[in-house]
Amino acid sequence: VLVFTFLCRIVGVDGSSMKTTLMDRDLLILSVLPYTPERGDIVVINRYTKEPLIKRVIGVAGDTVEIDEEQHRVRINGVLLDEPYIHVPTYPEGMAGKTVEIPDGKVFVLGDNRVASLDSRSIGLIDEGDILGKAVFRILPFDRIGSIYEES
């Protein structure tokens, strides 16, 4: 019990914003140890809605993020981001024609299902302090148990 209180939590996925990486009703183990978010991390954010959000960190402090309106892809520091987990185009929504510079203590997050995600395109940058933790492992459903990160 102490392990789950101080080191990790179990969280459920509610919705399709991280599809196909995470599906509605997946159960995840969330590490709640203090850490510095990195690009590609899947994190749980608590602040912007009644329920916590599960999103992928796309940009970190010092990065410049833009959404290429012609290719419908994300650019980090001018370079197209390799996102093998994306299966739909990335539309700029509220970021059309904008470049976002990420200051210290903030991150830029997106859902993997970009057409159905409330994320930094609409709610802005996320304070690192609003990140509850990093998702590290899927425990349900049993046929998808294991790492939620693609092997490189």
Protein language model features and the residues they cover:
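Single-pass alpha-helical transmembrane signal-anchor segments
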Residues: 1-3
